[in-house]
């Protein structure tokens, strides 16, 4: 009977959970929603396409630095005050991003936006695990899971729709709607806590500096490496050097410090450490697939941002039908089995795309997207529960920061490797196909003859018609090379998810969620 009283959750607590989940959703969405509008933002701030990549990179740098700090600063200022200040600043910087007139301004505003927005992701996770009793946490984790899987899927659609209808600044101004709602819910639903300023002064400031330099350099290296041709760039060389030096220094500082900013010792807890490793692989697959599909549709099929977003929606919407069933499954089955099944389904959806051809467009991705949408809810939610099941209440904030930063790092590593893989494999296939194409090949002769006749009918210039036929042949070779490269990238994602599905069995078996509440 005691369990039933523990299971009662007040409306005020649910409002607090929903408010923080809304903030996490907004923070995750803010990457994909702007990626869909980079072309328009580039024109608005007068930058090149390569420079515009910093619109996303600067946000990710700010986010990756702040996530590890949330547990410490949350204890210093209290959850309520810490969230209120950061959400308010996030809205201020969102507004400034919409008014930016040149690249430097945009980079600064986006970095600060990421620094304040990144707070919302682990804090939402912490509120769920500290405010809800064990039997109700699956529901809270489902809500959190929506932010991790639904936001990246629908972000391109929302970004394309807002940009086409109202212009690119609206992708930043739209944050005011959920932001104000979150401010109200946090203000009224979370109790104020006393300040703990001595904890601020006793914090490991040296480790904080090492962490900021190391992780910031790592993200810059990963996100900008492909654009700047990796180690041929002095900037990329310096970023790599800083990351290699300062990340180990940060780890050493945290392990020897009596008051670490990030309690890395928690990773020795078997389930948290292994689940975080699986979360790294899941992040690489989740954000990698969100990166691959739009890139393919825009590069190979010449889709607009809005068309790409419409193709991505099918990844997001079916998840809303699946998520409500996840808590029941978590109460009935081994969490490892649910994650295993979800990873296999997700991986299978990627493997459906390994035999693409140049006619493979949005409609051909639909079946795979729906299957992917069916698998994703069964990965992130039970994996989150598995990671935090053995943590004490006072360890939840640090565990949340570690678990979530691994997904973000996985996403950055995954997209960087996939971006490089596309370029390298396209060049490889272009070379191999080119070896087989000779003027004496009957298929090549037939292609050139047919295209020359068609071109001649429009131009009336025999020499020009033949030259245009050669250009069309070259374009066809390049298109096929890209298609094969993208197919191999989807194969790589499938292998990564298979690896994650196997690794999850190394975790200790935990009681079905909700079983603990009965004791």
Which residue stretches match the model-derived regions?
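Hydrophobic transmembrane architecture of multi-pass small-molecule transporters
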Residues: 2, 6, 37, 51, ...
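Transmembrane core module of solute transporters
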Residues: 11-71, 75, 80-83, 89, ...
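Cytoplasmic loop-to-transmembrane helix junctions
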Residues: 51, 136-143, 395-402, 485
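MFS-fold secondary transporters
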Residues: 93-98, 113, 186, 352-356, ...
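Cytoplasmic helix-loop-helix junction between adjacent transmembrane helices
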Residues: 113, 117-146
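Glycine/proline-centered helix-kink
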Residues: 122, 143, 148-160, 164, ...
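Small-residue-rich alpha-helical segments with characteristic i,i+4
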Residues: 151-156, 365-448
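Symmetry-related core transmembrane helices of the 12-TM Major Facilitator Superfamily/SLC fold
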Residues: 172-187, 211-214, 239-246, 488-505
């Amino acid at each position: 009977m005691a369990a039933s009283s523990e299971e009662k959750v007040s409306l005020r607590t649910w409002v607090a959970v929903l408010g923080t989940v809304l903030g996490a959703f907004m923070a995750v969405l803010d990457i994909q929603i702007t990626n869909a509008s980079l072309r328009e933002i580039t024109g608005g701030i007068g930058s090149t396409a390569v420079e515009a990549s910093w619109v996303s990179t600067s946000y990710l740098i700010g986010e990756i630095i702040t996530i590890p700090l949330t547990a410490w600063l949350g204890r210093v200022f209290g959850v309520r005050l810490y969230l209120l200040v950061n959400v308010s600043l996030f809205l201020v910087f969102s507004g400034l991003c919409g008014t930016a007139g040149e690249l430097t301004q945009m980079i600064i505003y986006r970095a600060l936006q990421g620094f304040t927005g990144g707070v919302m992701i682990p804090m939402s996770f912490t509120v769920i695990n500290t405010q809800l009793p064990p039997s109700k946490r699956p529901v809270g984790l489902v809500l959190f899971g929506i932010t991790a899987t639904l936001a990246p899927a629908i972000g391109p659609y929302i970004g394309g729709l807002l940009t086409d209808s109202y212009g690119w600044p609206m992708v930043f101004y739209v944050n005011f709607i959920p932001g104000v709602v979150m401010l109200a819910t946090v203000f009224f639903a979370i109790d104020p806590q006393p300040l703990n300023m001595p904890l601020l002064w006793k914090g490991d400031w040296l480790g904080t500096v090492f962490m900021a330099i190391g992780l910031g350099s790592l993200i810059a290296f990963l996100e900008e490496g492909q654009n700047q041709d990796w180690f041929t760039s002095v900037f990329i060389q310096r970023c790599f050097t800083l990351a290699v030096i300062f990340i180990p220094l940060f780890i050493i500082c945290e392990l020897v410090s009596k008051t670490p900013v990030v309690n890395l010792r928690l990773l020795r807890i078997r389930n948290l450490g292994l689940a975080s490793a699986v979360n790294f692989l899941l992040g690489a697959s989740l954000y990698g697939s969100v990166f691959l599909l739009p890139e393919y549709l825009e590069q190979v099929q010449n889709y607009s941002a809005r068309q790409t977003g419409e193709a991505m929606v099918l990844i997001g919407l079916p998840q809303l039908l699946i998520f409500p069933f996840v808590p029941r499954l978590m109460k009935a089955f081994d969490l490892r089995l649910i994650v295993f099944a979800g990873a296999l389904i997700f991986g299978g959806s990627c493997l459906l795309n390994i035999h693409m051809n140049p006619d493979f467009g949005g409609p051909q991705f639909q079946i795979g997207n729906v299957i992917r949408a069916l698998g994703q809810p069964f990965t992130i939610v039970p994996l989150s529960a598995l990671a935090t099941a053995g943590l004490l209440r006072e360890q939840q904030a640090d565990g949340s920061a570690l678990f979530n930063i691994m997904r973000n790092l996985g996403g950055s590593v995954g997209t960087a490797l996939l971006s490089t893989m596309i370029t390298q494999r396209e060049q490889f296939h272009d070379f191999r196909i080119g070896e087989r194409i000779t003027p004496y090949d009957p298929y090549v002769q037939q292609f050139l003859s047919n295209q020359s006749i068609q071109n001649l009918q429009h131009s009336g210039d025999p020499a020009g018609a033949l030259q245009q036929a050669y250009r069309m042949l070259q374009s066809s070779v390049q298109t096929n090379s890209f298609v094969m490269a993208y197919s191999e990238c989807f194969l790589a994602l499938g292998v990564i998810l298979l690896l994650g599905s196997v690794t999850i069995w190394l975790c200790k078996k935990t009681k079905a969620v909700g079983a603990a509440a009965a004791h």
